[in-house]
């Protein structure tokens, strides 16, 4: 998605060979118009897949997921990373290991909002080692729902998350695929469009 | 806002005289079309106020704030409740006391995304005791920005948050004002429309 790649080039800050900071339009400040375009793009790629629900994770997945849900006309459920007083019943949970924080944490979705009739599109802001995506996949499967695919705003293709998900048979649609952050520069995977 | 009130009546769960659970469309599952209508309503109420930025707080404020930002054509910044590795520089912080959790926590916004040239609309999902709103007000003022008003999706009018903010001179626009949750029933404040 060219508009996203240009935004990353213009505003992304390469903090290290591993870390790209996009706090000006996705992870802290949000560009609503770009989120709408991202939502339209995900909706277009999954338009014929019979999606009934989008599952994402707080906080940075919410904006792209809601814009996708608006376009597809389906609800969005966001997994919680932190305990909520009113989120208590019928919890589906998964452990997610954070390589950056080096901590294991629980994510949770109420089973009330996912059923075995659902065909789910999982959306997240970043895909790196794939821990959050695997956690969301686990939760969706616990509900007995099926998975149409995984939509990622920014993929760090030099980390193993994508390949592992693809090997497991999941369709991964990433709107910007980063080949490398070396030498302080963002290089994208060259994709051949059919 | 009648569509929101009907949704609360149909899907809200009164957990006690103090707590209303709206996990089916706002706090856990999100109804994107309703969020768009909420965004349109906030945008309409603040259309002539010269808003340059929207400030909200993760996670449930994000969806209504982004829809409002989309309509007004301005960026959204969400305050973080939890430490982020990439959010480090130039932090504006405030302490927020949670009556429900009985804990004090820090919220933070990077000063990079707020300036003394900004005229801010603060948006949040709930207004009860007003602690989160006061925290956001403090952060916006630390940046030297001015505040156009505070947009609230659901106000618990029987708690003191609104009155305190109005006494301090802030304009509070709440789309659904709840008079009482007694006897397991949602009663709205009767408003006279001019």
UniProtKB/Swiss-Prot annotation, chains A, B:
CDD domains: PRTases_typeI (cd06223). It is found in: Cytoplasm. It holds the Pfam family Pribosyltran. GO terms for biological process: purine ribonucleoside salvage; xanthine metabolic process; XMP salvage. Its main location: cytoplasm. It catalyses: XMP + diphosphate = xanthine + 5-phospho-alpha-D-ribose 1-diphosphate. Pathway: Purine metabolism; XMP biosynthesis via salvage pathway; XMP from xanthine: step 1/1. GO terms for molecular function: xanthine phosphoribosyltransferase activity. Disulfide bonds: none annotated. 5-phospho-alpha-D-ribose 1-diphosphate binds at residues 128-132. HAMAP family: XPRTase (MF_01184). Belongs to the purine/pyrimidine phosphoribosyltransferase family. Xpt subfamily. Homodimer. This is Xanthine phosphoribosyltransferase. It comes from Bacillus subtilis (strain 168). The gene is xpt.
